[in-house]
Design a protein with these regions (language model features):
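Short, extreme N-terminal segment that most often corresponds to the first beta-strand
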Residues: 1-31, 181-182
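Charged interaction segments
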Residues: 27, 38-182
Length: 182
């Protein structure tokens, strides 16, 4: 069983582009049963829309999606050396229907923040016009809060306050509410 990776994704583009990415996130496939019916990411277990897409001033739409996948966004939605994309493409080249965030961003912008607490890392990606504009990964840090509720500097992972582990979700210089770039 894999460690789960929680992600939050923002898609900006046409309603059709948003629907296409959602279809890839929610796709049901089994290469043991033959060719999948459409493009898909790998081992995405949940992709839930945060309400309806919101219309932007420029006529595009923005949709937030929350979900979880196996191990990392990198292994499930990208085409790197240790990705499901590469291994399935190698094992089933004749019926392969996998896709990546880069491929799906040809006519939209996609930004993803993820967190995998089992191995203690977080990811941040931005894709636009098929290009990766941001590929960041960092360790999940822990910290405390001062009396005003602002985060203090990072403290050791094993720091406890009484019986409570102090965990600080502040990484990539952002607060719990992600500072979206798209």
């Amino acid at each position: 069983m894999p460690n789960y990776c929680d992600y939050e994704m923002k898609i900006k583009g046409s309603k059709e582009a948003i629907a296409r990415v959602l279809e890839c996130l929610n796709a049901d496939y089994n290469y043991g049963e033959g060719k999948p019916s459409h493009k898909h990411f790998f081992r995405v277990f949940d992709a839930t829309k945060d309400g309806n897409a919101r219309k932007n001033a420029d006529g595009t739409y923005t949709q937030l999606i929350y979900g979880y996948c196996a191990w990392s966004v990198s292994s499930c939605m990208l085409d790197g050396g240790f990705s499901y994309y590469q291994s399935v493409k190698k094992d089933h080249p004749e019926i392969f229907m996998g896709t990546t965030l880069a491929e799906q961003s040809e006519d939209c912008e996609i930004e993803v923040f993820s967190e995998e607490p089992g191995m203690g890392f977080s990811e941040h990606y931005i894709f636009k016009n098929g290009e990766c504009l941001c590929d960041d990964e960092c360790e999940i840090t822990s910290g405390g809060y001062d009396e005003s509720g602002k985060p203090t500097e990072d403290i050791d992972w094993d720091t406890y306050e009484g019986e409570t582990l102090i965990f600080n979700p502040y990484r990539f210089g952002r607060t719990q509410q992600f500072l979206w770039n798209i």
